[in-house]
Amino acid sequence: MRNHREEIELALAGGAPEIIPLTFYDGLFPPGFDPKPLQEKGMALCCRRGVFNRHTPNVKTTQVNEPGGGLRTIYETPVGTVESLSKKAALAYAPIEHPIKSRDDYRVVKYIVQDMRYEPVYNFYLGEIEKVGMAGKVICGTVYEPLMDIQVTWIGQEQFCYELADNEDAVLELHEAITENHKLLYDVVANSPADYVLYGGNVVPEMLGPDRVRDFIAPCWNAFGERLHEKGKKIGCHLDANNHTILDTVRDSLLDFVEAFTPPPDCTVSVAQARAAWPAKRLWINFPSSAHLEPEEDIRQATLEIVRQAGDRKGFLMGVTEDIPAQHIERSISVIIETLRECPR
């Protein structure tokens, strides 16, 4: 039986396992789906787990279930109250309303983020490593970078674009507060048993602008990266969008690996282009989601082309980081596994 954990760790260290690892987020399996047959064929698990719990000791947080599956979250602070509303979706809750709805809400959210504390749960993480065993790799999931946190958690993507134009000073003041708070998180993660750490992601350069990625996102990668490198740990980012305008920013950053990178036809940068642009980075791709829906021979050819573009395969891994329609999972993953087995190093 293959030791998937060792194979993944070898690839993340820059080596080339005999067979390119294929991982699947363990949280993406639909209800009732049994992954064991695919694991027996050669699929590994990628298990993102935390090494801390977050809490805000001076903020009263109340959640109220609303008709129609809505979940309202109310944050009460000494400087005011904000609310958000989300609704149950396929695998999580989708945001309907975000906490920041007016300029006055910024000071409330600033209080919340400054009050955030991070409680280590190292024994939980060690237990997850033991539980997964050699079936895959447990990596440390953390939080969004400050600017992405503002966009995704506190404002919402569309309104965020307006806020950058109308209230940029308030956005940047909140960014500074979150950045300062994250230094507490850096220490908790750096002192944890995790060896590979994911920080941030879902960056859409067309929305943020490549200059903001360079000026606000990358410095946070680097600050966290410096702290992790002091402890011999590696940092990666979930960069699953169109990366063609930030190739140089990623190259010049302290990121050790890029995770969830998605090649064409879904996104704009090919595996070959990424390997050429980031020779010092490990590349852990997301197999293009649209390709899972294609006929089996097309899936096979797509796999072969990705392997060809990966070159010497050192520091290269495949993964599934997006949900696949349940009826296509076993068929598509089986083809990819079989194809990877046919083209060993």
Residue ranges and their predicted role:
Residues M1-F29, Y111-R345:
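Active-site loop segments of alpha/beta catalytic cores
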